[in-house]
A protein has these predicted regions:
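Alpha-helix capping and helix-loop boundary segments enriched in small/acidic/polar residues
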Residues: 123, 127, 165-169, 197-205, ...
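Helical "lid/coupling" subdomains associated with nucleotide-phosphate turnover
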Residues: 214-216, 252-325
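Short acidic-glycine loop/turn motifs at beta-strand connectors
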Residues: 5-10, 28-36, 184-188, 272-274
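Phosphate-binding loop and its immediate beta->loop->alpha context
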Residues: 9-144, 148, 202-262, 282
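Secondary-structure transition/capping motifs at alpha-helix termini
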Residues: 138-145, 186-190, 221, 311-317
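Phosphate/ATP-binding catalytic cores across multiple sugar-kinase/actin-like superfamilies
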Residues: 96-111, 150-162, 292-322
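Gly/Thr-rich phosphate-binding beta-strand-loop-beta motif of the actin/hexokinase/Hsp70
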Residues: 1-13, 159-193, 324
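Small-residue (GG/TT-enriched) beta-loop-alpha framework at ligand/catalytic clefts
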Residues: 137, 141-156, 168, 172-177, ...
């Protein structure tokens, strides 16, 4: 997630406390030895979850509390989540999303912010949009306007586009969802005339593929992990601990032909295998190997775009712009 404000007629991204342009949409509940509860949001929450998985492995304390919950994918549902570290019995997806919005709001400290424009996937239905509005109210915003993400992308692109009018295809491969949208631009007016997507296709899925097809098989070849195969939550803790390395290497391979990772160099403990040997992840992944692994995920996105074009009797050469988000 990210937040921006208008300054001198320009949209300016507000950096996080870690000087990053984006904030992980992650919420973590903790409780110290005194029983005091707190909520961490963003990179601190994300790092804490990785640390939990690693600590669980190193101490042999495995339980069902270790794992990720993709609460943003459940917006508008009646799902609730609970654990012993929460200050109240349970949280729903809107309340968790509100914690992320509160953190983003805190990044603007030079003015009082009461109104917000929140972008949502084009595939969001009414109940999901209502849930987003509710999250904004919980976060303290008095006014909230929702804007479809393809429209937001087109608005940003259109500011510098040489050819304004025509039909644009927005290819929005996000962290957790994929949206394809056809946008008609005429006399400066943007309108989405058809959308298609997958609420369970995004960067997180790519990380899972890297873990399941590359990192996990690598460790199985190096260590004796039979008990991890037999105990569901033991394996889940190790898989969760590998998601950090997977994401780090995937991002690195966007700019390089190969990427190295070493838990030993980072002083990370992944526990022991069934023979009592320390588990260390020492691996080099090439861009070619990564692309081979994640190709099926991108094929899903491409096929969604093909179906969208076919449904509207359009061919690729009839598009004036392709916008990659």
């Amino acid at each position: 997630s990210a937040i921006a404000s208008m300054e001198s007629g320009k949209s300016v991204i507000k950096q996080t406390k870690n000087l990053m342009d984006t904030l992980p949409s992650c919420v973590y509940f903790s409780k110290n030895k005194k029983g005091e509860r707190s909520i961490r949001v963003g990179i601190k929450a994300k790092d804490s979850k990785y640390s939990d998985a690693i600590q669980a492995l190193s101490k042999g304390e495995i339980g069902e509390e270790f794992g990720y919950i993709e609460f943003k994918r459940e917006m508008g549902s009646d799902k609730t989540y609970s654990n012993e570290n929460m200050a109240k019995p349970s949280y729903n997806p809107e309340e968790l999303s509100a914690e992320v919005l509160k953190e983003l709001k805190s990044l603007i400290n030079d003015e009082v912010v009461n109104s917000v424009v929140i972008t949502v996937p084009a595939m969001f239905i009414a109940i999901q949009k209502d849930a987003t509005m509710k999250a904004a109210r919980i976060a303290g915003f008095k006014q909230c306007i929702l804007l479809q993400e393809p429209i937001a992308a087109c608005m940003a692109y259109g500011l510098s586009a040489k050819k304004k009018d025509g039909r644009w295809l927005v290819f929005d491969f996000g962290g957790g969802t994929f949206d394809a949208a056809l946008v008609k631009v005429e006399d400066g007016i943007l309108s989405v005339f058809d959308t298609e997507g997958d609420n369970y296709l995004g960067g997180k899925n790519l990380d899972e593929v890297v873990v399941n097809q590359i990192l996990w098989p690598h460790l199985k070849n190096e260590y004796y992990l039979r008990s991890y195969e037999q105990v569901e939550w033991k394996k889940k803790a190790l898989i969760d601990a590998l998601k950090g390395p997977a994401e780090e290497m995937r991002i690195a391979l966007s700019f390089a032909d190969s990427a190295d990772y070493s838990t030993y160099d980072r002083n990370l403990n992944l526990g022991e295998d069934d023979n009592g040997e320390d588990i260390d992840l020492e691996i080099t992944i090439t861009k070619e190997k990564l692309l081979d692994a994640i190709n099926d995920q991108y094929e899903k996105a491409v096929n969604i775009c093909k179906d969208l074009l076919q449904r509207n009797n359009l061919a690729g050469n009839q598009l004036s712009s392709l916008i990659l988000v």
